[in-house]
């Protein structure tokens, strides 16, 4: 079974089609009429618009002619480049376009059974976390007999024009498509999770290791059904569509249609002086202005390969506008990468994606308010929603995506297109269960851009530990819904922090409700004991308070370990001490290296401290070798930390 399907406007395709066939009429959609209101609400029409059905435009109309990627698409006099680029990208992976265009063969014109055609189509979009089916009629806007928006160079092919109409209906009108980024569109067509990579900031041309690391990620994404496109930014409007020295167009988005790591045979190793080639195949959606540099069809490299060589290596091209280029040239020529990962197919590990729908809401009570504005609003920032997740091991890449509810359907009522949104990421105590109230010791682990786009992204390699993500609008006191998605190679257990402190219950009242909250950060343990010179010491921490404990990651082969491990405890009394122990991880039996015992009273100094390790037995036990540096903050206000 597929994912749950939401019916837009509650229209049921099969029922509507059966009614039309029974009545012998073509469908006319009452919820998206062939009127100017379905086109624009601000722009002026460049001429008289006549809505025509495909059979009035072509003698032999088809939804798809041959292979969906065989024909080039034109944006039309009122269309936009982002839409054409997204169509081109969508056509690369059959698993994606067949999801957006369900049962495409059943929706096709059948000249042998014209009575089965009812002028009705249905398409599916991933809309704010839900797969949504949109039903439309086949009336398309034309001026002087020509389609106003996108059309195919095969003049009897209509899949893109009909898909575009369904998308316009979903967002309110055709004008609502203006300003959408290719990332927005691809996500809506496929449900993929996007990451935008700045090729220049990544230094992929300078750092060889980073370049091959990028290739590995792109290869994995593509072979798992992801979509990848790239572009060359133009510094000004005048340079849009200007050709580079190597034949590429600025301002246009190229789609990756293949990626290969090739091992060369002995003869080709001598020719190219390398054993491996890292290659990508790209396509220009316009079907022209191909790459003219190395590995292009006119290049010396290409001519040195026989037809058999190309076939054996897989260096083939099936469409006009397709070309091969090396990884090095790819990194050197393109500025921005849109990497859209396929996270909806269980075969590829659906557990890798975790998502939650939330909202920014306003309340006069600071503990109830959930619209605190960006990080600049220090007094209210932590009044935003907060989400915690845990990275189980060092070095995992985590991609975070925050999407606001699309406001385009409200533009005709004077509402803004989008709010400025972003998010902050903090490394927090490993045992945190309640909301953050002040940022005393938390490390700021990352921040997204703040911009008025529909979606903002952040990609980070994170250390093992717990993290709190705070989604925000730039201004405080605004309300809106949002969708937060996190993608990682391992489950991260994303969940919202809703409580400010432990709940009052019969159980904790009987045991004693907490009166003090204590936050501790252990920075380092230095000068640790070695029994003999060549002994390997692999230290780790155990921070205890009563029956609760927090364990740090193991540091390998060092007597001067940097931990920066955080813990937080809600204590019934300061008579319950906090104990920080240092252990040596060994194969059979771990070795105790020493501990410190703290009262952690609210009146204690909050500055960084350093204490010698001692044997077990309290603060007066015998001193051992080594010392730890730490910071402790205690408060009798349970909502301070």
From Swiss-Prot:
Where is this chain's protein located in or outside the cell? Answer: Cytoplasm, Perinuclear region; Cytoplasm, Cytoskeleton, Spindle
Name of this chain's protein: Calpain-6
GO BP field = microtubule bundle formation; proteolysis; regulation of cytoskeleton organization
* Gene (name only): Capn6
Induction, as annotated: Up-regulated during the osteoclasogenic process. Inhibited by dexamethaxone during the osteoclasogenic process.
The record's note on quaternary structure and interaction partners says: Interacts (via domain III) with microtubules. Interacts (via domain II) with ARHGEF2 (via the N-terminal zinc finger).
Matches recorded under PANTHER family: CALPAIN, CALPAIN-6
Going by the UniProt record, its keywords in alphabetical order are: Cytoplasm, Cytoskeleton, Microtubule
Of which family is this protein a member? Belongs to the peptidase C2 family.
Q: Does the keyword section mention Methyltransferase?
A: no
GO annotation, cellular component aspect: microtubule; perinuclear region of cytoplasm; spindle microtubule
Domain C2: from-to ranges: 498-621
Q: Which residues form the Calpain catalytic domain?
A: 26-343
Among InterPro entries, the record links this protein to: C2_Calpain, C2_dom, C2_domain_sf, C2_III, Calpain_cysteine_protease, Calpain_domain_III, Calpain_III, Calpain_III_sf
Just give the chief location class. cytoplasm
Pfam families assigned to the protein according to its UniProt record, in alphabetical order = C2 (PF00168), Calpain_III (PF01067), Peptidase_C2 (PF00648)
MF terms (GO), sorted A to Z: calcium-dependent cysteine-type endopeptidase activity; microtubule binding
Q: Where is this region: Domain III?
A: 344-495
Query: What's this protein's function?
Result: Microtubule-stabilizing protein that may be involved in the regulation of microtubule dynamics and cytoskeletal organization. May act as a regulator of RAC1 activity through interaction with ARHGEF2 to control lamellipodial formation and cell mobility. Does not seem to have protease activity as it has lost the active site residues.
